[in-house]
Amino acid sequence: MVKESDILVVGGGHAGIEASLIAAKMGVRVHLITMLIDTIGLASCNPAIGGLGKGHLTKEVDVLGGAMGIITDHSGLQYRVLNASKGPAVRGTRAQIDMDTYRIFARNLVLNTPNLSVSQEMTESLILENDEVVGVTTNINNTYRAKKVIITTGTFLKGVVHIGEHQNQNGRFGENASNSLALNLRELGFKVERLKTGTCPRVAGNSIDFEGLEEHFGDANPPYFSYKTKDFNPTQLSCFITYTNPITHQIIRDNFHRAPLFSGQIEGIGPRYCPSIEDKINRFSEKERHQLFLEPQTIHKSEYYINGLSTSLPLDVQEKVIHSIKGLENALITRYGYAIEYDFIQPTELTHALETKKIKGLYLAGQINGTTGYEEAAAQGLMAGINAVLALKNQAPFILKRNEAYIGVLIDDLVTKGTNEPYRMFTSRAEYRLLLREDNTLFRLGEHAYRLGLMEQDFYKELEKDKQAIQENLKRLKECVLTPSKEVLKRLNELGENPINDKMDGVSLLARDSFNLEKMRSFFSFLVPLNERVLEQIKIECKYNIYIEKQHENIAKMDSMLKVSIPKHFVFKGIPGLSLEAVEKLEKFRPKSLFEASEISGITPANLDVLHLYIHLRKNS
């Protein structure tokens, strides 16, 4: 049977959900093919969304019309701001989720969205015509034709689950791997490599002894992810902290020879920032304990996820390890930990629109691109969906810059540098992180969302008013010169503030940590009518004014540099500071400008600086 749509999405995980929903929202006919409809939106690993860097991604996805934020706000069990004591640039919202509620909400959202149809089957191969994808075939002899195809297969491509010496061809425990599609992608000439990730054991909630464990509460004023969320008052459950100990470590050491990670059974590279417990014991042998979080998987608290105990050790060893830990001495394991090895395609095979360079109309998103994490997958799925629709409409792709969004950083890192380990987002990856805060996501991306038809006009108008109010009042504060007069000193004293000794503008005064929103309104009467969202932005902009201005200068400098032309017969060979790889790629593609050079995978900002210098030197000589 042959069926037709505008866009096909393969895979119903976090990337596939965002890709299919956003494309349907933008008015094209979308068909989602997934192995199991009931696992759409399943959180395969930890029961949480957000975190450092990841919270930024979730909020960016939300502003650009994505679903992850709103689903999380409907299914959260505990909400916290991580790094709350640090500056706003590095804070991250994180929520424990009810995995059942999240999955059901996501599935129903997909099933009830106009322009979006779903079928339960397995994609086996791509249909190509003149190096352009035109559809797929499935395991039940269906043929789907479409103008664009987005592949979001997660860990299912030639997936192998490892528990001790046992191996099974699964994409997730108990679910079939996608071997035919994996073979098809290899045959098409993509650069396919292997990665590994893992998950932690789960234990029955009624078998845990919580007495003596440290209770971990949510925030008193819980933060939420979606700007569309109203009247937010979630039920908050506690997590609990426990630790491994020397006995735990000895049990693991005694069984290193049975660990797939060390026996040579696993060849794929695992996530650097989420290592298995056996890897931690091996690499940090001097540590006497490792922190573990017991996290409820649902509101019923029937199962707890042991965060920090990712493992692929044999079943009997997992039993001994868990029973050696305080609070888990009599724990009943409901699901064992396991490692999974899977195919991914080097993301240097992609453009910044997430379209493959080899095959026109084919987009990749999520773990197939070498990333790890629900949020990273959602961000890529969203962008692939948007760009597939724009390509259908013969419009320019939507590319976010590194100075605009963490999504821009994520995609730029992937397509220019590639990866040899599962890539996850951190605030440290963003060189412009002072500009890319969670608190200003709406102001950063609202205009893009509105232009793409993904934000309501009335809301956007209010947002623009707020943005104008921020700019006007910052200008007014800069022009407001304060002197240590009797009146000024008296007012500062009444507010419990230290006196000023010299002239100072309003921005410098508000840079003080102690100057909260209430004091701002009290001292500067023109700030009284402003809403809290505007005041908060003014406060942050004042506090980091010098650094923010510096980052804007750097961006302007970079934008100016990228406009520099590269002479037609410019010789790249022999330039100190350019790697052999960079020289080979520059000679091969012969970019006409530094901007074109920046689009070549493997060309770094440092390479561009060197090129800029030598273009200037050779012009002058």
From Swiss-Prot:
List residues binding FAD. 11-16
Superkingdom of origin organism: Bacteria
- Does this UniProt record's set of keywords contain tRNA processing? yes
What biological-process terms (Gene Ontology) are attached? tRNA methylation; tRNA wobble uridine modification
Q: Where in the cell is it found?
A: Cytoplasm
Per UniProt, subunit arrangement is: Homodimer. Heterotetramer of two MnmE and two MnmG subunits.
Q: Which InterPro entries match?
A: FAD/NAD-bd_sf (IPR036188), GIDA_C_N (IPR049312), MnmG (IPR004416), MnmG-rel (IPR002218), MnmG-rel_CS (IPR020595), MnmG_C (IPR026904), MnmG_C_subdom (IPR047001), MnmG_C_subdom_sf (IPR044920)
**Transmembrane stretches, start-end:** none
The UniProt entry's sequence similarity note says: Belongs to the MnmG family.
What is the official name of this protein in its record? tRNA uridine 5-carboxymethylaminomethyl modification enzyme MnmG
Give the matching SUPFAM superfamilies.
Answer: FAD/NAD(P)-binding domain (SSF51905)
Q: Which Pfam families match?
A: GIDA, GIDA_C_1st, SAM_GIDA_C
Function comment? NAD-binding protein involved in the addition of a carboxymethylaminomethyl (cmnm) group at the wobble position (U34) of certain tRNAs, forming tRNA-cmnm(5)s(2)U34.
Give a GO cellular-component term.
cytosol
Q: Output one GO MF annotation.
A: flavin adenine dinucleotide binding
